[in-house]
Amino acid sequence: MQKEIQPKYNPVEVRCACGNTFVAGSTKDEIKVEICSECHPFYTGKQKNIEKGGRIDKFKKRFKMD
């Protein structure tokens, strides 16, 4: 690799909209994200399971085949 054309890779503070910050490596000066592992529903255990039903359920409901 040619050193003079490669971007500088350095540690950067990543800021989430929830206020959480952590350090990661990047070629950018700063990184802002909307969601991180501290506030994402999958990681916090607060996710909602919504079952609307699939195509078969909709078909049965439409033609009253329950």
UniProtKB/Swiss-Prot annotation:
The keyword RNA-binding applies. InterPro entries: Ribosomal_bL28/bL31-like_sf, Ribosomal_bL31, Ribosomal_bL31_A, Ribosomal_bL31_sf. Zn(2+) binds at residues 16, 18, 36, 39. Part of the 50S ribosomal subunit. The lineage of its organism: Bacteria, Bacillati, Bacillota, Clostridia, Peptostreptococcales. Signal peptide: none annotated. Its cofactor is Zn(2+). This is Large ribosomal subunit protein bL31. Pfam families: Ribosomal_L31.
